[in-house]
């Protein structure tokens, strides 16, 4: 193969050979991240929770996605893990490493989100948010980062939220956990900066996903929400967030670490 052909192949499949674990990937942003990675040459392990998908009316979504991914990347797999269970984060990374032969890129997309008035917040709600949105990530990072550092290359991208800097009054605990998570990402970005490992957060604003499908039941109300959400007066789509994730995971993102990058149509302005 000529050098020019090799360069062209790299441009078309910049993630060829990369082994990627994506949490919360059966729907929405995580789903599009998985699709784009496979389209650009990676092998992926998608994490999902069968129980949660069934509870929210999306039973079988992960199986459909895995089938689609395997058409391009036969070694790609789906991993059903409840991140609410103790030590599940480390177990997930271990299973992904066994399936893929290692994890080069970790995309933390899974989260729980409960809307509630501040006065109605319970200890159970706080514990659930903390467990899924923070503790599980600590476990995953403890398992994933040492091999990345030893290899001299790795990428961690966390899906944050506009709420971590502009919190919704009904998402107080969720927003606090997202802010804490980015603080963790910044801390570890500094620790591993000399190891060839970068860690960043991508913070979406209003994105049209299954999580907010209930808002689109009344299209007039939805369009009003879009107009007020950001200076672009529209919701983003999962692909727009996923594209930023892939940039950060690529060699082109090698000099970016510890950043919180908004993908929000200018809502942070």
Where is each model-derived feature located?
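Substrate-binding pocket helix/loop in short-chain dehydrogenase/reductase
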Residues: 117-130, 222, 226
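C-terminal substrate-recognition "lid" of short-chain dehydrogenase/reductases
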Residues: 100, 234-263, 268
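Conserved glycine-rich cofactor-binding loop
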Residues: 19, 26-27
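Short, small/polar-rich loop/turn modules that mediate ligand/substrate recognition or access, typified
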Residues: 193, 198, 256-258
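A glycine/serine/threonine-rich, flexible loop-to-helix segment
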Residues: 54-60, 194, 201, 206-230
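Active-site helix of classical SDR
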Residues: 141, 177
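Active-site loop immediately N-terminal to the catalytic Tyr-X3-Lys motif
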Residues: 119, 166-172, 194-195, 233, ...
